[in-house]
Amino acid sequence: MELFPVAVNGVSHAEDPFSGPLTFIAPWNYKVLATLMFVVTAASLSENFAVMLVTFRFTQLRKPLNYIIVNLSLADFLVSLTGGTISFLTNYHGYFFLGKWACVLEGFAVTYFGIVALWSLAVLAFERFFVICRPLGNIRLRGKHAALGLLFVWTFSFIWTIPPVLGWSSYTVSKIGTTCEPNWYSGNFHDHTFIIAFFITCFILPLGVIVVCYCKLIKKLRKVSNTHGRLGNARKPERQVTRMVVVMIVAFMVAWTPYAAFSIVVTAHPSIHLDPRLAAAPAFFSKTAAVYNPVIYVFMNKQFRKCLVQLLRCRDVTIIEGNINQTSERQGMTNESHTGEMSTIASRIPKDGSIPEKTQEHPGERRSLAHIPIPENKVCPM
């Protein structure tokens, strides 16, 4: 099977897409795309580099539950470094000037790192479910468990992104001619089987994990809130986490649903005529996830923000770490910290995962969940 047939992605290329721009697309369209990719890539690289740098500098952030957060930032950083940078350059030139094999490598790298980031979100959801709901009783999330999660993410993603390089489907130039992607437009049944399998394992399955884990987590929080009082403050952790979960799921859907829907529609109807500029939109949406993932999953964590601010002020890291150690208990008890709220709830759930019966207490003795000392897991971005 030829990697690049005469007709590439449904566009008849008497003009080689690797030798010059498509003549029926005005040059200014490519300049607009280049500008957008420059903004997205610059923002993503700076944000995700900040996440990795701060985690490296502050030992308080190097906790098992944060391993997958850093992994997400690494994957997003690599997506932007490879796909974002190359997309900016190729759109600036108006065509994929790097050649056929560079197209294969770029298509593989962007798809691989993108799926690593996507599955990192699913593993993060599972780990939060594991910590809060305690499905295995008193077994805690430790470094070896987090490391196994990372190994799964990178291995599973590689298994489902290497086949096009080896002949099961292919990586080819996109319809607009400036990026490379899996060959959605192939009419070959052999290629269709890969697209369907890829759609199930790299979109439906992780989305299912995310939805199920967060729904069970919210259900557990609701039970805890109902058990420990009817005061507004007792409901606050549940409301905060519910809002955060909604944001996470919506962000996931915004980033990946257009790309998944596009791949299925084009696979089902290979001869469909789409404007190349419209066909480029789903891939652009998926790349923007690298910008808002750090905001949702990292920058909204109070302790991380404090470390980042201190680092930007160029203060001595040793002094900063000492200050954080001295105030960690107070941070855990603050109402503003998602970390404290999640750890508080986890500490109130019995080791067997059951919900204790309500006990009679005097009005003056009733306390909010947010004011209970936190014994562990103080760094738990939520």
Curated annotation (Swiss-Prot):
The chain crosses the membrane at residues 36-56, 68-88, 104-124, 148-168, 194-214, 245-265, 280-300. It is a multi-pass membrane protein. Its main location: membrane. Keywords: Chromophore, Disulfide bond, G-protein coupled receptor, Membrane, Photoreceptor protein, Receptor, Retinal protein, Sensory transduction, Transducer, Transmembrane, Transmembrane helix. The modification N6-(retinylidene)lysine is found at K287. GO terms for biological process: phototransduction. Disulfide bonds join C103-C180. Belongs to the G-protein coupled receptor 1 family. Opsin subfamily. This is Opsin-VA.
